[in-house]
Amino acid sequence: FLPKSLFTLVTDKSL
């Protein structure tokens, strides 16, 4: 799992 993917996932959840 790449950090960018995780960040994107978290951002999607935040949004």
UniProtKB/Swiss-Prot annotation:
Its cofactor is FAD. GO terms for cellular component: membrane. Optimum pH is 6.5. It is found in: Membrane. GO terms for molecular function: cytokinin dehydrogenase activity. Signal peptide: none annotated. It comes from the Eukaryota. Monomer. This is Cytokinin dehydrogenase. It comes from Triticum aestivum (Wheat).
